[in-house]
Amino acid sequence: MDPKGSLSWRILLFLSLAFELSYGTGGGVMDCPVILQKLGQDTWLPLTNEHQINKSVNKSVRILVTMATSPGSKSNKKIVSFDLSKGSYPDHLEDGYHFQSKNLSLKILGNRRESEGWYLVSVEENVSVQQFCKQLKLYEQVSPPEIKVLNKTQENENGTCSLLLACTVKKGDHVTYSWSDEAGTHLLSRANRSHLLHITLSNQHQDSIYNCTASNPVSSISRTFNLSSQACKQESSSESSPWMQYTLVPLGVVIIFILVFTAIIMMKRQGKSNHCQPPVEEKSLTIYAQVQKSGPQEKKLHDALTDQDPCTTIYVAATEPAPESVQEPNPTTVYASVTLPES
């Protein structure tokens, strides 16, 4: 290592330490400008103190940046050390940072809580040394506010209504609140940054619009509240809601019971009618057949039958399967004449 370069770095470190000690004990008169940034975003810190550094190759420029968590901190963290005569790359660079040699600036990648603090910069240009500091403050961005009615009081005598509104956010650091009406008039004093607003309205001014603005040093978001949805005239209806509930709930139970009971009776009647329906019987047909005797018979038998009809009637019952179509109401009788052959 070059002895001259090593000596220069030692001198620069000594001056930087002396500056930090002087600043920490309050002996310095240097004021650190404050840089406000959003948490999680990248931030560029210029390492020049309001004048352009001559980066000629004939001149030597050395930069040392350290970071302290508090003004009186005795142990500072080394962030970057850079020697222009050795090239465009720094000798040391802490993780989470990016050094830009063209404009001599330091980029903080994705601001984190541990990135917040005092950045002390020492710049050596030939025989002159500059020392200055920058304070970085990080704030979480404010989320959209929510407005709720905490309390509502109805004055029946004079028809006025008193409301207590609350404006809150879920995210955000050092959040302050301000209230205004539709015309933009601030309803609270500048010193009062409360998230609560107490208003009293008459019947003629119940349809109003109010704005709540939640803000911090890096963000500001407003939310509009329409009072017509929370009008005081709805107080009477809200008071009558308990007895309406006590009346409507039993009535609904009775109606449901009647509907279920009616459905059960109808189902039973339908099942009974299907059960009592007579089955389809097979249709019976009766066939009458006559058998006639011919030829000589024994005399005795012939004499016994002379007074009778020479034909003998035979009854035969025939069964026919029932058709699938509509059954006929009356049976059909078929008569057939059968003649016996001569013996």
Curated annotation (Swiss-Prot):
Residues 1-24 form the signal peptide. Residues 266-343 are cytoplasmic. Residues 145-228 form the Ig-like C2-type domain. One of its GO terms (biological process) is negative regulation of interleukin-6 production. Its main location: membrane. Changing residue 288 to A: Greatly reduces SLAMF1:SH2D1A-mediated intracellular tyrosine phosphorylation. The chain crosses the membrane at residues 243-265. GO terms for molecular function: identical protein binding; SH2 domain binding; signaling receptor activity; virus receptor activity. InterPro entries: CD2/SLAM_rcpt, Ig-like_dom, Ig-like_dom_sf, Ig-like_fold, Sig_lymph_act_molc_N. Residues 327-343 have a biased composition (Polar residues). It is a single-pass type I membrane protein. Interacts (via cytoplasmic domain) with SH2D1A and SH2D1B; SH2D1A mediates association with FYN; SH2D1A binds to phosphorylated and not phosphorylated ITSM 1. Interacts (via cytoplasmic domain phosphorylated on tyrosine residues) with INPP5D and PTPN11; presence of SH2D1A facilitates binding to INPP5D. Interacts with MAP4K1. Interacts with PIK3C3, BECN1 and UVRAG; indicative for an association with PI3K complex II (PI3KC3-C2). Self-ligand receptor of the signaling lymphocytic activation molecule (SLAM) family. SLAM receptors triggered by homo- or heterotypic cell-cell interactions are modulating the activation and differentiation of a wide variety of immune cells and thus are involved in the regulation and interconnection of both innate and adaptive immune response. Activities are controlled by presence or absence of small cytoplasmic adapter proteins, SH2D1A/SAP and/or SH2D1B/EAT-2. SLAMF1-induced signal-transduction events in T-lymphocytes are different from those in B-cells. (Microbial infection) Involved in innate immune response against Gram-negative bacteria in macrophages; probably recognizes OmpC and/or OmpF on the bacterial surface, regulates phagosome maturation and recruitment of the PI3K complex II (PI3KC3-C2) leading to accumulated of PdtIns(3)P and NOX2 activity in the phagosomes. This is Signaling lymphocytic activation molecule. It comes from Mus musculus (Mouse).
